[in-house]
Amino acid sequence: MATETTNPAAAAANARNSAVVRFAGDSGDGMQLAGTQLTDTSAILGNDVATLPDYPAEIRAPAGTVAGVSGFQVNFAAEQIFTPGDVVNALIAMNPAAFKAHIADVEPGGIVVVNETEFSKTNLKKAGFEPGYNPIEDEKYEQQFKLYKVPITKLNQEALKDSGMSPKDVNRCKNMFALGIVYWIFDRPLDTTIRHLTETFAVRKNRPEVADANIAALKAGYFFGETAEIFPVRYSVAKAPIPKGLYRKVTGNEALAMGLITASKLAKKSLHYCTYPITPASDILHYLAPAKNFGVKTFQAEDEIAAMCAAIGVGFAGQLGVTGTSGPGLALKGEALGLAVMTELPVVVVNVQRGGPSTGLPTKTEQSDLWQAMYGRNGDCPAVVIAPQSPGDCFNAAIEACRIALTRMMPVVLLTDGYIANGSEPWRVPKESDFEPIEITHADYEPTGEKDDPGFAPYTRNENLTRPWAIPGNPGTEHRIGGLEKANGSGAVSYDPTNHQTMTRIRAEKVARVANMVPDIQVTGDEDAKLLVLGWGGPYGSILTAVNNIREQGKKVACTHLRYMNPMPSNLREVLAKFDQVLIPELNNGQLRLILRGKYLCDARGLNKIQGKPFLIEEIEQAIELLLSGEWGDAEALYPVDGNVDVNAQALEV
């Protein structure tokens, strides 16, 4: 079977620099698997890839409704990319609801493959179309897009009619038929997916008939693209110039889990992951639970508070305690996180942000927990906060969070978001020698036996204000522990007003001195630019790409990205002072902007997107253009609407 373009001239003529493909269908149609396989295949071919999974919030919305549509977007390219793409080049819509939910994102002239079988009157009604109207029969869509009507469900049934599978199981294979069509259109080989299907179903699940059926459907879709002659053009995307090394595809949650394991080895501590399931952080538990051979212990607690307290207990016992959650869970953990601050015990809290408040948008991304991570506890209760910028960066950020927690005896909040947690990218596998060991010394005390022996002082401090880490059971280091205020030095319970003020200042200064572990922030772009675009967390790729695009037009702009949110880099004040204007794009209502205004008197402008979606590159470009041209006006912040940043479309519609 030929799976590559055999005509070199044709391949060159149809070469693309990148392609953005989106699969969309019911949550049971296997769109996540199809997208994941296209990602894996493209990565193995040597493309750079970036993905954007999109899950419905409902466990199982009514079939055929817009609320139940599941999507997976893949951007594969012949150059380095940082986002899953602004516009869709090819949409595969498995039913009318998927078509309705995603057609607006397809570029003019883009490819739209629809599963014609499912565009029945019943399904059109479920999707909310007017009676008697079928969008794939509307000339405007045929004029606007390359619209291909393929009866995928019917063709899949015909391909598997002799498989011996039940009609229900046959229907589950139609995602592979659709994937086969995409593989033909974009000149992708089948072997990676065939190997995956064989290993998953024939080997691990001992269901070879399921593997055979899916492989047959995949090949049938591919051969349909090759023989039906309805697709006049075939495309190819060359390899990307990626530095040599061993690569694997990782999601943010997967990279974070591996980073936690690596940190435990660097510290020579066992990793105890204590958690309560919550979207979108649950995958971290799924990745760590099978890792017992790495000394990992997982504990699924009865609630968020118990999980947090268990992780603190692990730190008290002398090991690496980590807990994971999302926004609502972080709120529940708040009191116990304050206990970790008061007791000065090491613990890492992973918060995968999602749309809020309350239950909010459980499966959608947001950056709205920054204030909660920094200030969301009673009393003056500081904690270190780190925010990785990409799926692969979650690995390094996890190691740094553990390093700070273990060596400085304090809680650290690792603030990711749903976009980078579920998104994926090629990740260059590092060597163990790339990382410094996490050096830890435990407290030891030999009683003198004298009457005036002061005993072990658990709250004495070194130059970083770090207190000794005493492991229970070590003779001579017995001490009080708990949430009541401690006497400076001895750790005895104290209600003295002056002592409380001293200890409050010590706890704040202890976090501030972590700045000596934080590298200076680096600026990318024009040194003489007047405008700085400053971001944090997941929007990194969109910001960098937008700034590069603007600079290619000959306009001067610079950008930088915060990874350490508290304490911030020591040179940040100096960097901010160099620019006349600062733009802060963030997926919230301006939380970082307000922090920087209060801390550095920085009169920044905000680009605030609170839609459960990551930034489009174009949205940031438009905001930059408005500031450079002086058309921004007096607004402190602008909000994108339907992909556009318009100063005249900012009125709040009630």
Predicted regions and their residues:
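Thiamine diphosphate
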Residues: 18-108, 258, 263, 271, ...
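Conserved thiamine diphosphate
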Residues: 85, 91, 140-155, 364-413, ...
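Active-site cofactor/cluster-binding pocket
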Residues: 2-256, 261-267
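Flexible, low-complexity linker and terminal segments
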Residues: 242, 250-259, 267, 397, ...
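Flexible, glycine/charged-enriched surface loops at secondary-structure junctions
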Residues: 3-5, 49-52, 192-194, 205-215, ...
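Short glycine-rich or small-residue beta-strand-to-loop segments that form or flank ligand, phosphate
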Residues: 19-26, 178-180, 271-274, 321-324, ...
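Gly-rich Lys/Arg/Thr-decorated short loops/hinges at beta-loop-alpha junctions or inter-strand turns
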Residues: 18, 158-160, 201-202, 230-245, ...
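Short gly/pro/ser/thr-enriched loop/turn and capping motifs at secondary-structure boundaries
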Residues: 56-60, 119-122, 305-308, 329-332, ...
